[in-house]
Amino acid sequence: MDLYDKPASVFVAGFIGSPKMNLMPGKAIGRPDIPTVGIRPEDVEVTEGDGWETKARVVETLGSDTIAHVRVEDVGEMTVRLPGHIRLSDGDRLKLRADPARQHHFDADGRRMEGQTA
């Protein structure tokens, strides 16, 4: 589970897990000091507070899970795994947030940055 919990690089983060980890520039989440931020689809949740404004592009309802491919303003495409009781349709708008403690930070060479919190 260490590869999953603490991927050593962007390369490893990109293929361990299904759906794969979302990778984006740190500036997309207000952290220009972090070259790349990784967020696992299951570490994203719907919120009514502060968060990303998104639009669902493709929704897969799988029973216990709902996989949504969303477009995040100023970030790009992101895949999220939500509880199955959350019903979405293509085109729905929702606000999402990611737990900063669950984010993964990578340096300019793609290596894991230890001791970083968002």
Range-by-range predicted roles:
Residues 19-22, 30-118:
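Non-catalytic connector elements of ABC transporters
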Residues 1-32:
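Internal alpha/beta loop-helix hairpins
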